[in-house]
Amino acid sequence: MRKLILLLLVFVASLIAKPNVVILATGGTIAGSAAGSTNAQYDAGQLGVDILIKAVPEIQDIANVKGEQVANISSNNMTNEIWLKLAKRVNELLKSGDADGIVITHGTDTLEETAYFLNLVVKSDKPVVLVGAMRSATSMSADGPLNLYNAVSVAADKSSAGNGVLVVLNDEIHAAREVTKTNTSSVDTFKSRNTGQIGRVYYGKVVYTAKNLKKHTKNSVFDVSKLDTLPRVDIVYSHANDYGDIVEHLVKMGSKGIVHAGTGNGSIHNDVMVTLKAAQDSGV
């Protein structure tokens, strides 16, 4: 009888046990600081992860939350080196069992790029959530604290598993593959225009309205576990009166791949087409 009671107690304890969520901080506006609460100008990446966590003590009611400082930058300065560091740390934490979910605080300038990169290289179906803010931490009516609270709620929610890397801002949950920043200042900036959001989170209450069916994370073919660097890939935008010498310069600078963002339905200027074909013939 005692053994049965003990087993029941263990079972009940497992049901009420809080999940473990690790916050990996990289800086951004969510960690930004201004001279005053009404200052539009601020410096991104000024506050450490411990300060961000202490600012929202309620997250400890949702999960056992720990933080690590991976970087503290404005996300316009994001690098391949930080990407690899993030990817390897996320995979390490999720594989070890030390984390049931991951939250990454990030600047909004390149948040969607980091989210999609991780969507391709994370090898787990556990929740990985990127979160940012459009107003600095010292701003009047800062959006960061509630965004962080909601992001931890999403990462701790079992229904988030298997949806790939997620982006949470302004009460919305977006799939990394679809989301993009659409406005330079509005808190309602992140949108998935082709598919729409896949869920909502309202003061910690998580509700999914769609399922991410695209291949991602553990089903992705990409693996960076043995890589120390990523190859250089450049983006070339097309425009009227375009020149092909930009492509030639990129090849000389060591570009290993070129993405051409064409006009209309991917159209390429004749002069650029010549240099792109030459680049391709050279192995780019």
Question: Can you annotate each of these PLM segments?
Answer:
Residues 18-92, 274:
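ATP/NTP phosphate-donor binding region
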Residues 37-46, 110, 116-129, 144-150, ...:
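A glycine- and small-aliphatic-rich helix-loop capping segment at beta-alpha/alpha-beta transitions
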Residues 96-111, 253-265:
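Short acidic, glycine-rich surface-loop motifs adjacent to enzyme active sites
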Residues 104-126, 268-277:
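Short Gly/Thr/Asp-enriched flexible loops that form oxyanion-binding sites at enzyme active sites
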Residues 259, 265-284:
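CN hydrolase (nitrilase-like) catalytic-core segments centered on the catalytic cysteine
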